[in-house]
């Protein structure tokens, strides 16, 4: 008996393990036996998976006898094919909303299970199977487009008897276990709202909502009764009911794709035999009743979420009420015209109800948080079919939208997105543009905040000079036109104003100003450095120019200047300050990305003269206006401005005024030929960036020179164009970044670094015998040849005496001509006798030098010892 006992071994996670193995095999491309091609790209797959997920591939692979066939998909994109492969192997795929329609179309053509209607019943739709074990919250279908908020779960009891009309999603997987707590909380709130209908009725604040909701429910129930009242009608009644169903399904809030497809699929065989038509008609009425009940459920949910439904407890009560209302009409038979009109009227009621719900959403925030049903046009997501009882009851659907469970209607309207827009959002945008155009001070702060913080502590602006066409209040800024006409009104220079941010305590620190020297000699106005009155929140740099005016200016601009057209793309800010001298200050902000302009402020702080002026405690009257700049009146490019300045500099005018700023920080003012200056000398306090020496600016006279090439960045002038190019390449805007390892000195070019390195190089390389050091070899040789008395490298072979120059040695050798038979002293043996005098000792005078005292020392102290030996051997050979 023991041998007959059998044990049952069950693999609990057999299905999930088997599915995960296919995914691993696909990633490793192991045991793949077919290839799918789309748009020139290939994807390998398994025949078993394709056959199981698509009847089309199953039929196609049965007809192919190749071991590794290749299928080329013509009208399918590679991205869609990749998404379908992920869906078949993993059971889920993430895709954007704009690609959803194309993916569903491609899946429909390939008959992918779970994404298409791949029935195998020919042209006749099979009878839908009942699925009592499914919960009402998970409505079946090939794919269900449903509201983001699962408000339909409140009427789950009424949908227990609804049939499963899909019958084709055997391979679709259940959703994952996520956001269970959020869904349970929403279900509890929904159940509480359904049980307390009297509280919802008392909370209704708008009587029109109740009337429209009741009318919508009555008409929808009437349409349901009319659609289900003629089961024994003929083919004509079936066609009329089909016509009634089409406008009704278009007005449903929850769009049932499967029901729409069944309606369209049953329209064709409706003209067949009477026997088959009767069977199809029974199926049709059952499906229509289910679709209509779905629409009524959605309307009930919307009405309950807004507190406007009276006596609505479920779908059964709604259907009974609809039957009672539509009783007289059902007795007389279905009328196609009246049914169609009722369907259209039901759609209108649904739309009106949705609009009223949107308008009254602010009065029911606490209920919208529970149900969170917005309107007909809210976001739609894909919900897969529920296959298991536990998953359908406990789990929520993973949607592709943001979690808006705890957001109110006003917060949803403010949320960015395409589905949240509309007339209200466009009106808000127009109002924002109108307010923004009139708030110039706020605009300046916004521009400063939106500036890229990676540009550093400073933000350099364009320094190309501009000109003023006229002195009228409605003036515009231009450059090219004035330069072409002679540049009579070109301003002399600009002032770069750096506004420092406030300290930690909020106290103003001040600003740094720098007056750019004049670029041309055709200027007619004076440039002074002033302090800004308005301090934005962020650190900014502006170009400030002050024009002296002989005539009186108005203190305020015309109010029409504040309402300029919104379509202008370029905008500049003009701040006008009235003073005793009637001077006008112009603050122009021009962003640029030129390297020269970005290096300008740093060069000013390091090498140029700057003035520091604290922000005033009490600001005077400041008028802010906006001047739009047309496309033809924009500032010229830097290179074009440079060429124009070169042409203008050729025309030297002796009666024009010019301001230059020298390297010491003094303001040099050029006066007219008649000796009268345009403005009185004004003392300014400057701080030199290099030495930090405070001195007072003075005025001097400067004669016209021949410097016609001016730098458009720093204002320095040169006579030769090559000098200007050298200045731009190596001096202007170039930071000395080559640091010497021996000293803190920095160089701008490699040549200067080499020269500085030689100064700190090893001293024993260029050391003379006398103990002096030289930087170069040429200077050392010149010293040894002309100056050094200790360096003698020429030696006589007979007397072993040293000479400084070769010519002295040759003249000394001539004295040995009479003693040719004498053996040189270097080859003779040392003699004990002394007193031998040579006949030529008396003739040597100053030519013969004494024996080198350092000859007995180590030869390592003489760097040219080897050279001396080579030259001596060469002389003997000659």
Swiss-Prot record:
Residues 32-97 form the BTB domain. SMART domains: BTB (SM00225), ZnF_C2H2 (SM00355). Residues 162-175, 228-251, 263-293, 329-340, 546-569 have a biased composition (Low complexity). By stage 11, isoform W, isoform X and isoform Y are expressed throughout the mesoderm, whereas isoform O is expressed in both mesoderm and ectoderm. From stage 15, expression of isoform O expands to all tissues, whereas expression of isoform W, isoform X and isoform Y becomes restricted during later stages; starting from stage 14 to 16, isoform W, isoform X and isoform Y are expressed in muscle. From stages 14 and 15, isoform W and isoform Y are expressed in the gut. One of its GO terms (cellular component) is nucleus. One of its GO terms (biological process) is positive regulation of DNA-templated transcription. This is Longitudinals lacking protein, isoforms N/O/W/X/Y. The gene is lola. InterPro entries: BTB/POZ_dom, Dros_DevTransReg, SKP1/BTB/POZ_sf, Znf_C2H2_sf, Znf_C2H2_type. One of its GO terms (molecular function) is zinc ion binding. Residues 115-200, 228-340, 542-583, 826-863 are annotated as: Disordered. It is found in: Nucleus. Pfam families: BTB. A zinc finger (C2H2-type) spans 709-731, 794-816.
């Amino acid at each position: 008996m023991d041998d007959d006992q059998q044990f049952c071994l069950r693999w609990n996670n057999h299905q999930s393990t088997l599915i995960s193995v296919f995914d691993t095999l696909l990633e490793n491309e192991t045991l793949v036996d077919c290839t799918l091609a789309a748009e020139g790209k290939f994807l390998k797959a398994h025949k078993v998976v394709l056959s199981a997920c698509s009847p089309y591939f199953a039929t196609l692979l049965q007809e192919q006898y190749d071991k590794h066939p290749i299928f080329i998909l013509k009208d399918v994109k590679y991205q869609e094919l990749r998404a379908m492969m992920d869906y078949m192997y993993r059971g889920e795929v993430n895709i954007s909303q704009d690609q959803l329609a194309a993916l569903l179309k491609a899946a429909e053509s390939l008959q992918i299970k779970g994404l298409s209607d791949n029935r195998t019943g020919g042209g006749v739709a099979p009878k839908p199977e009942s699925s009592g074990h499914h919960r009402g919250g998970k409505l079946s279908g090939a794919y269900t487009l449903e509201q983001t908020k699962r408000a339909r779960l409140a009427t789950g009891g009424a949908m227990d008897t609804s049939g499963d009309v899909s019958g084709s999603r055997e391979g679709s997987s259940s959703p994952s276990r996520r956001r269970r707590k959020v869904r349970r909380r929403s279900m509890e709130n929904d159940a509480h709202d359904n049980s307390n209908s009297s509280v919802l009725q008392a909370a209704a604040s708008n009587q029109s909502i109740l009337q429209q909701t009741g009318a919508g429910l009555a008409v929808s129930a009437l349409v349901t009764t009319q659609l289900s009242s003629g089961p024994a009608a003929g083919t004509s009644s079936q066609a009329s009911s089909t016509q009634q169903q089409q406008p009704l399904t278009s007005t449903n809030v929850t769009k049932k794709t499967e029901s729409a497809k069944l309606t369209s699929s049953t329209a064709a065989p409706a003209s067949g035999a009477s026997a088959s038509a009767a069977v199809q008609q029974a199926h049709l009425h059952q499906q229509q009743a289910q679709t209509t009940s779905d629409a009524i459920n959605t309307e009930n949910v919307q009405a309950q979420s807004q507190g406007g439904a009276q006596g609505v407890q479920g779908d059964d009560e709604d259907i009974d009420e609809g039957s009672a209302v539509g009783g007289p009409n059902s007795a007389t038979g279905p009328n196609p015209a009246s049914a169609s009109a009722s369907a259209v009227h039901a759609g209108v009621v649904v739309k009106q109800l949705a609009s009223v719900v949107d308008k009254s959403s602010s009065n029911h925030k606490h209920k919208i948080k529970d149900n969170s049903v917005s309107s007909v046009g809210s976001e739609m997501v894909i919900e897969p079919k529920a296959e298991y009882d536990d998953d359908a009851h406990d789990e929520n659907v993973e949607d592709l939208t943001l979690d808006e469970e705890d957001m109110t209607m006003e917060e949803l309207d403010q949320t960015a997105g395409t589905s949240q827009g509309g007339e209200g959002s466009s009106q808000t945008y127009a109002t924002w543009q109108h307010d923004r155009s009139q708030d110039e001070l706020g605009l300046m702060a916004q521009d400063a905040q939106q500036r890229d913080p990676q540009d550093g502590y400073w933000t350099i602006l364009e320094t190309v000079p501009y000109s003023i066409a006229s002195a009228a209040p409605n003036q515009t800024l231009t450059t090219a036109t004035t330069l072409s006409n002679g540049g009579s009104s070109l301003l002399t220079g600009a002032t770069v104003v750096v506004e420092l941010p406030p300290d930690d305590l909020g106290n103003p620190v001040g600003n740094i100003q720098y007056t750019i020297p004049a670029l041309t000699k055709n200027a007619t106005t004076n440039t002074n450095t002033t302090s800004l009155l308005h301090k934005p929140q962020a650190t900014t740099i502006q170009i400030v120019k002050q024009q002296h005016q002989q005539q009186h200016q108005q203190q305020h601009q015309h109010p029409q200047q504040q309402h300029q057209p919104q379509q202008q793309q370029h905008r500049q800010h003009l701040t006008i300050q009235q003073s005793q001298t009637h001077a006008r200050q112009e603050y122009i902000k021009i962003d640029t990305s030129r390297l020269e302009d970005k290096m300008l402020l740093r060069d000013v702080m390091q090498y140029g003269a700057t003035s520091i002026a604290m922000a005033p405690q009490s600001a005077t009257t400041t008028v802010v206006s906006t001047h739009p700049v047309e496309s033809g009146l924009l500032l010229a490019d830097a290179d074009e401005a440079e060429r124009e300045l070169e042409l203008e500099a050729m025309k030297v005018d002796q009666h024009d005024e010019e301001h230059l700023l020298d390297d010491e920080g003094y303001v040099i003012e050029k006066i007219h030929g008649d000796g009268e200056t345009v403005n009185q000398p004004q003392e300014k306090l400057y701080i030199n960036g290099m030495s930090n020496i405070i001195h007072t600016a003075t005025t001097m006279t400067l004669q016209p020179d021949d410097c016609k090439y001016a730098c458009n960045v720093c204002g320095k002038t040169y006579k030769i164009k090559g000098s200007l190019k050298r200045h731009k390449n190596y001096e202007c805007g170039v930071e000395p970044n080559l640091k010497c390892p021996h000293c803190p000195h920095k160089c701008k070019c490699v040549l200067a670094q080499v020269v500085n390195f030689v100064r700190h190089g090893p001293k024993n390389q260029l050391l003379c015998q006398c103990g002096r050091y030289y930087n170069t070899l040429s200077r050392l040789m010149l010293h040894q040849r002309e100056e050094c008395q200790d360096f003698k490298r020429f030696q006589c072979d007979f007397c072993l005496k040293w000479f400084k120059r070769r010519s002295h040695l040759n003249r000394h050798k001539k004295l040995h001509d009479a003693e040719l038979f004498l053996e040189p002293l270097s080859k003779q043996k040392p003699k004990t006798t002394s007193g031998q005098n040579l006949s030529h000792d008396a003739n040597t005078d100053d030519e013969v030098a004494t024996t080198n005292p350092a000859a007995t020392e180590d030869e390592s102290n003489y760097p040219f010892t080897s050279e001396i030996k080579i030259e001596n051997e060469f002389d003997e050979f000659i």
